[in-house]
């Protein structure tokens, strides 16, 4: 691998995971760390401080060169999918452990990846790359606005009405810029009630590509994965083969030379590609447990020039052995309205579970501070059951979480245990939200004109001024926590009397941000969104227009062809010739004959 040393350009549990794998491979290891974030550095042979943080590409490359590292492992998040960073590493003579810059430009850009998938014959969702296109697409139903780069649920918002689109677009851009150093976003059709399935791909520089089966990631809240399962349960063999084949076709088209995950949404017997992540995934652990393949070690060897044959993956993929489940233990709690509240504090107790089939990936220990600057992930608990199927693996994971004792900060362990106890929690991506709504108390009510912080974090914008009238639901300010932006809205209509927050300031959960004086005669329950958007297309109108489209000749090619074959014209062709443009008004295009007595009532 050139110089037998690797710089790990990340933090937390993934830095620990890569450092250990590199040391087992006989490599000298170098860690980097930001101020106050050095929990992982004890495992490295050498550590370099970062003044500019983990997105400072120049500092990372300079640190690799200064410490004699021939390669750099980006982990996940931060710069792991940044093609320019990979290119700069290559120019400096530092091997980037991951796909080539060319592949990263293809797959690290979700819009380009969608286009590549479509060309490769992989089914995709309808999408829009610009705000104007997104407005048009929204007329046909709800959308998901997503960051073009990165992942982890950051830079994602569901949009159901035209009034929500512009704000969601800007929030996604801002989150993406903070987390991934790029702010492009796009939109695609929201497919609700679907499962989230992904395929682990491995490729080498000879063009050989294979898969290591699939994972189910449907247990999510706010588009962030909570629990993953390998292999995906209740997936028919015929459908699994189609999904695996589609993932391989895309990987070959992209020229994958390392690890990549190809992600799909499944609904009924159909599936659609949503994105490809050309990097190590947080949930790589469950694939390792059921296949026996050390994915980080494979990454390092492929970066050194080894082939799939060299790492023992040239033949058929190893058959999955049992089932593995991963639960992400985060420093956060989830409110009944679905909002996620990051937690911070000093960990006073951190007792991880042990026992057969239990693995815990973490960088933390008692005495460490947990803040809101980075991801909320404290640890990953992985349970593997060689026998007994997904039920046995889930039961083992529940027991492990019951033994996991964390004091000093609140965690999501109670929610994880509840979800794992729920039958078929992988049925679709909305199951966790349904569970939270049914079991958790709602958001706090407004009292005394106070606008308070729902979580600890940093104020990134203040959007009102003293004396300004605001309406219920209007954006007051934005708090950034764990690289996610959270809009704080006015709980009722009023006038801003005091502002206690400033841009760049840090606030704690429950802190007073602003005070409002209620406006006499105002309806405090009427949200800002209740005001009519004159440009908005109502969902029922959009659906009616869509159905009307079925009656047009352009959407009836077989009927038109049949009419022409008889030497005749369609009624609409006659109308077009007889009437001036836009002068013909049609009523009842969707009316049908009254045939209830003959055909009986509809049953669908």
Regions found by a protein language model. Give the residues of each.
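Terminal-region recognition feature
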Residues: 528-604
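Generic structural motif
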Residues: 345, 451-459, 490-498
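Short, compositionally biased
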Residues: 489-497, 520-536
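Catalytic cores of soluble metabolic enzymes centered on carboxylation/carboxyl-transfer
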Residues: 247, 285-450, 456, 475, ...
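Short histidine-centered loop motifs in beta-beta connectors
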Residues: 454, 461-469, 498-502
């Amino acid at each position: 691998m050139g110089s037998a040393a690797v710089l790990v350009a990340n933090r937390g549990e993934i830095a620990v995971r890569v450092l250990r794998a590199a040391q087992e491979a006989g490599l000298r290891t170098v860690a980097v760390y930001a101020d106050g974030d050095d929990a992982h550095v004890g495992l490295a042979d050498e550590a370099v401080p970062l003044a500019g943080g983990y997105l400072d590409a120049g500092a990372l490359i300079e640190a690799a060169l200064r410490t004699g590292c021939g390669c750099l492992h980006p982990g996940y998040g931060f710069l792991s999918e940044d093609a320019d960073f990979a290119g700069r590493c290559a120019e400096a003579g530092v091997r980037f452990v991951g796909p080539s810059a060319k592949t990263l430009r293809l797959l690290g850009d979700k819009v380009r990846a969608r286009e590549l998938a479509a060309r490769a014959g992989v089914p995709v969702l309808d999408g829009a790359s610009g705000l104007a296109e997104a407005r048009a697409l929204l007329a046909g139903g709800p959308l998901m606005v997503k960051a073009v780069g990165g992942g982890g649920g950051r830079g994602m918002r569901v949009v159901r009405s035209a009034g929500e689109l512009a704000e969601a677009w800007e929030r996604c851009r801002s989150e993406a810029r903070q987390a991934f150093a790029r702010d492009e976003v796009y939109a695609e059709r929201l497919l609700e009630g679907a499962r989230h399935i992904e395929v682990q791909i491995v490729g080498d520089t000879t063009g050989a590509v294979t898969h290591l089966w699939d994972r189910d990631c449907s247990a999510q809240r706010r588009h962030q994965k909570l629990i993953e399962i390998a292999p995906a349960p209740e997936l028919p063999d015929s459908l699994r083969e189609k999904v695996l084949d589609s993932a391989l076709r895309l990987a070959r088209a992209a020229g994958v030379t390392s690890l990549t995950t190809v992600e799909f949404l499944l609904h009924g017997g159909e599936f659609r590609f949503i994105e490809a992540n050309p990097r190590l995934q947080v949930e790589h652990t469950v694939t390792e447990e059921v296949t026996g393949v050390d994915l980080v070690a494979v990454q390092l060897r492929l970066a050194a020039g080894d082939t799939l044959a060299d790492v023992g993956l040239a033949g058929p993929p190893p058959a999955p052995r049992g089932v593995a489940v991963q639960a992400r233990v985060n420093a956060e709690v989830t409110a009944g309205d679905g909002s996620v509240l990051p937690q911070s504090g000093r960990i006073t107790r951190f007792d991880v579970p042990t026992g057969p089939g239990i693995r815990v990936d973490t960088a933390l220990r008692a005495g460490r501070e947990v803040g809101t600057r980075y991801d909320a992930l404290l640890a990953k608990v992985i349970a593997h059951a060689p026998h007994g199927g997904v039920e046995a693996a889930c039961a083992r994971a529940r027991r492990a979480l019951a033994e996991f004792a964390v004091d000093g900060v609140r965690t999501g362990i109670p929610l994880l245990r509840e979800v794992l106890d729920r039958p078929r929690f992988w049925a679709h991506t909305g199951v966790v939200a349904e569970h939270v709504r049914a079991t958790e108390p709602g958001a706090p009510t407004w009292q005394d004109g106070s606008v308070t912080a729902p979580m600890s974090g940093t104020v990134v914008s203040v959007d009102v001024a003293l004396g300004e009238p605001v309406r219920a639901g209007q954006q007051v300010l934005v708090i950034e926590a764990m690289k996610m932006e959270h809009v704080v809205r006015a709980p009722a209509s009023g006038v801003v009397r005091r502002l206690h927050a400033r841009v760049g300031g840090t606030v704690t959960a429950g802190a007073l941000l602003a005070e409002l004086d209620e406006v006499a005669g105002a309806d405090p329950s009427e949200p800002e969104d209740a005001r009519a958007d004159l440009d908005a297309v109502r969902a029922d109108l959009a659906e009616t227009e869509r159905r009307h489209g079925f009656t047009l000749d352009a959407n009836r090619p077989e009927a038109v062809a049949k009419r022409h074959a008889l030497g005749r014209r369609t009624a609409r062709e006659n109308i077009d010739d007889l009437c001036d443009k836009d002068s013909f008004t049609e009523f009842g295009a969707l009316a049908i004959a009254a045939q209830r007595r003959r055909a009986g009532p509809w049953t669908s």
